[in-house]
Amino acid sequence: MSEGQIPSSDVLGSQLGVGVQGASLYCPQENYTTKKQEKPQWLRPVDDTLAEDALDLHIVVKSLLCDTAIRYISDDKVLQESDADDDLITSDIDEDTDNQGDTSIVVNPVIPVVPKDVHFFKKVDVGNDSMFGVNCDTPVSFQDYIPSDLLRNLDDTLQESTNSSRPMQDAFFWDPTVANRLDSQYIQTASDLRNYRDGTEIIAYASGKTGSVLNIAVLTRQNTLHLNRHNNVTSIELHSPIKSIKIPGASESIGRRSNLVGIITENSFQIFRIESVHSRSCDVMVSSSEPLYFVEIDDLQVVDFAFNPWDLQQFAIIDIKGNWSIGRIPKNFNNNNKRKLQLIDNLHGTIFDPEELSSWKRIEWFSHFQKILVFDRSKMIEIDFMNNWQTEVVQAKAWSNIRDYKRIDDKNGILLTSREIIIVGASESNDPVRRISWKHDLDPDDTTLRITVQKVKKPDHILLVAFVYSMRHKRIYMHVFSHRKANLFQSLGCSTVLEIPGGTPTGIETILTLDHIDDESRREEDADENFELVVDFLVKLRNSSEVYYYALSNTQNSEPNKQETPIIVDHPEWASLFNNADEREKESIGALVSQIKLKERERISRVQNLIEHENSHDEDKYLQDLGYRLSIATNELLESWQKTKDESILSGSLSHSKLKNLLENSDSFASIPEFSSLLDQFFQYYQDQDVTFIGFEKLLHLFLHEDVPGLDIFYNKLLQCWVLVSPQAELLTKEIVKDIIWSLARLEKPSLFEPIQNEISRSLSGPYQDIISSWDMDDINEEDESNEFNFDSQFSAPFNGRPPFNLNSQSQIPTIKSSQSSGLARRKRILKTQSQKATPLSQSTQNLSVLPDSMTPAFTLMQPPSSQISFVNDSQPRNSQKAKKKKKRIRGFG
């Protein structure tokens, strides 16, 4: 067994364990790992079979799905009566109503909808009689005298209490009896079942000024990442604010989907049945049951309901006190005599707790058709309503409180508490067990936390993507679990926070995941190498009428959303920094992290290759070869500039180039100090060739706002900032330093600029030459500015007159000097620059404006003594050029 297969005592993060057995298990019978491994029998504490960047999700699609402020009027879409009792009679309406026009029209939100029972009367003029006015002559009533000192003290006390109180945004109040007022599911009508159709994806949501209008519409998909709502919307006025909307999900064992929509309003519970969906116009025909008014059932507000996944005609409800009941749904809503919802007399009970003050309650079916789960803030209770027994499964009164629960499938559900995300499953005896839990470290006092889950099916496992959101902010906490055979649940080890971009600072009212992801067609052997993850959901913000569609993917889209802000929150320092930032800072942080992710994806393969071959990679040999190639390419560039000198003068083009453009494969090294030493030697050598370079010290000062003596110091200071951003901070910092240096490193030849400047000046007409000649005529200011702003000394790398190698030696093989001498070399360069300003170069022995064809590279292996560098005198001496330039310097050209 290899060392990597032995379980170690690594920190498990916030995971509280795999099941109840332990964090690391030995599995002698089954192998849960991939086929490519050599069948290790150790069950790892987290699922590490996926690639590291497999869960690096970005927003690839953001679109407005619908606006609930736009209201619709529907005239005959609600079926109330029918001559036949069969509930399938209206299911074929889509084949018989091809010529039927649209029955819904868009109404201006300002114009109110007038009910039919409202009658209009003639205009009545109301007289403005004086008896309704205020008598100004009435004397002021007697008031008690209060000393001004007392009033002043009261004002000071009130101001102090106001300043010491919590901000208003923290004092957020919400109605716990209001659940999701938005839902979407696939439904199957009777016609779909007869014709073996998969069904139709619909959306149901509340709208209107009071939220009393139920809207049902069809969702259409162009492809996997584009979702649209059909414009033909069925709207029903319920005359009472809607508090909850649910479209049930049926069990996979019955082989069909439901066609029901359940609604809770302030005074009733009602169920709608979708009878048909027109195949072309997408017209939705619905029928409704009679409202079950709360005055008929103890006059208590019903806060939640659930449908039986195994019996679509059965439902369960629970009120604010914890009283629950089981009921039956009529098979046909089209008969007025059989439209009433019936509660079964002997199937009811209560979990009333006098110590529980919250009216928040939830009810959901469990692992069997006769078992339900009932929740309040402090406990989860399993109830078998057929055998008349119940047991308390979870008690959350001390350490944490229950926040939400969602059903995953017939055997599992996910429970959100104030401190954990818990996957609850059913054992072989259908008893609830705790599969796995993850400590999320969110605000334990936030009672608005909710959770939703999306299942992503893969060939050998299922991914459960959990979204935790709050009505207090716009951040979504995402954590992924994997579900493999034999009820093995594992965490994937890290969490991600996604900031919803745009809009005002507000909370998230609803996140609705869409059940359509199915990747069964992907081959199992390619699942881990080409892993593609796509999740999509609908988002409705608090106090907003717009519903947005989002799609997340771990692959880059052709048009990525620039406002995505995925933040890794496993580091407490980074999470604290992000939470305390304002909106503008968060936008900058999001853009920064997006660039980090993009850079990691672009260079992750090359960086990993460098790490794997770090020992076998000869760094010194690579840098030596890099120096040779850079020197040869520079010599060729200088020769080409000299050959095209006359053409450049006529065209007015300047001779300059980036070092990055001269080389390929210039980043395959890891030592920043040795790279800095290489650049120092390269700059020193080309000082005799009339070539200048940008001074890095001045430019690096702009990044850190402090003096930076070298690249190694710049790297260390950047590293201190990047350790909060990414676990790969060292590698990323090196890549950033390389990018900065190669993007800033430019070479130019100043001797070629003077003829171009003179040519441009001569080409101007008389008036323009006079204007240019009038610039900088003050000799005193000229001298001061010349001393203060000397471009040669501030923005050019100074030169030494000594080449880095002995060119007259035939036997000496040059090697690049170590980085320890770089500081001394820099000091010599500074002194040399100061001496150059006082003593110009002598042109009697050398003229550096012309390069021969036999130019010697800066880094050469062997140099014969006969190849000496010769120079040809230029037509215009360099000293006269400098004197002329100093006498009359033209701004903007020289």
UniProtKB/Swiss-Prot annotation:
GO terms for molecular function: RNA polymerase I general transcription initiation factor binding; RNA polymerase I transcription regulatory region sequence-specific DNA binding. InterPro entries: RNA_pol_I-sp_TIF_RRN6-like, Rrn6, RRN6_beta-prop, RRN6_HB, Rrn6_K-rich. GO terms for cellular component: cytoplasm; nucleus; RNA polymerase I core factor complex. Residues 881-894 have a biased composition (Basic residues). It comes from the Eukaryota. It is found in: Cytoplasm; Nucleus, Nucleolus. Residues 806-823, 832-849, 863-880 have a biased composition (Polar residues). Pfam families: Rrn6_beta-prop, Rrn6_HB, Rrn6_K-rich. Keywords: Cytoplasm, Nucleus, Transcription, Transcription regulation. The keyword Cytoplasm applies. One of its GO terms (biological process) is transcription initiation at RNA polymerase I promoter. Component of the core factor (CF) complex, which consists of RRN6, RRN7 and RRN11. The CF heterotrimer may further dimerize to form a hexamer. RRN6 interacts with RRN7, RRN11 and RRN9. Present with 237 molecules/cell in log phase SD medium. This is RNA polymerase I-specific transcription initiation factor RRN6. It comes from Saccharomyces cerevisiae (strain ATCC 204508 / S288c).
